[in-house]
Amino acid sequence: MAGEIPDFQAEVRTGTGKGAARQARREGYVPGIVYGGGQEPLSINVKYNDLLNRLKKGRFLQTLFNLKVEGQEDVRVICRGVQRDVVKDLPTHVDFMRLRRTSRINLFIHVTFENHDQAPGLKRGGTLTVVRPEVELEVTAGDIPDHITVDLTGKQIGDVIHIQDIALPEGAVPTINRNFVIANISAPSGLRSSDNEEEAAEA
């Protein structure tokens, strides 16, 4: 059920205070802290380039990580803040929060579509237009779905698929409190042109 959680490597940071943090930055690291989960806070260093690459991929604050620190047990964490240099806008500090398996968190979950060959609308030349390739859901940290599935069986041209049309995994709840659109099946351009011509003739 749960998707593969990406690893994030870190090292224990020896020393505390601004001096230790400055030393870490000089050595190519970004200082950070791991807190929560009923344990003592842990000072860490993460490689600057690793963090920067993760940030560039986007949705860093919505991604669950498996934090690996030498000498420590692996722990699931989510980033709760990235401090940046006010001039260069580059990361200078990062905060991670430990999560229990029962913790509730918001994550973007990928949407997959199945049974394309069972959709009459697609067989007639219609196009599946995906409005939301990912959906933000509130989920339990110990049971994160890899994806949610949209069954296209029986879908016709003009059909619109809303979030309430999808069977969500147990315990997963959309963070947006409205029946938003996931996808639709639009008519092929030739059919749309034909319809427009008929409407013009009737007018």
Swiss-Prot record:
Keywords: Ribonucleoprotein, Ribosomal protein, RNA-binding, rRNA-binding
One Gene Ontology CC term in the entry: cytosolic large ribosomal subunit
Keyword Transport (UniProt): no
Sample GO molecular function, one term: structural constituent of ribosome
Superkingdom of source: Bacteria
GO biological process per UniProt: translation
Transmembrane portions of the chain: none
Coiled-coil intervals: none
Pfam families per the UniProt record, alphabetical: Ribosomal_L25p, Ribosomal_TL5_C
Role description: This is one of the proteins that binds to the 5S RNA in the ribosome where it forms part of the central protuberance.
Oligomeric and partner information: Part of the 50S ribosomal subunit; part of the 5S rRNA/L5/L18/L25 subcomplex. Contacts the 5S rRNA. Binds to the 5S rRNA independently of L5 and L18.
Family, per entry: Belongs to the bacterial ribosomal protein bL25 family. CTC subfamily.
Protein name per the record: Large ribosomal subunit protein bL25
Organismal lineage: Bacteria, Pseudomonadati, Pseudomonadota, Alphaproteobacteria, Rhodobacterales
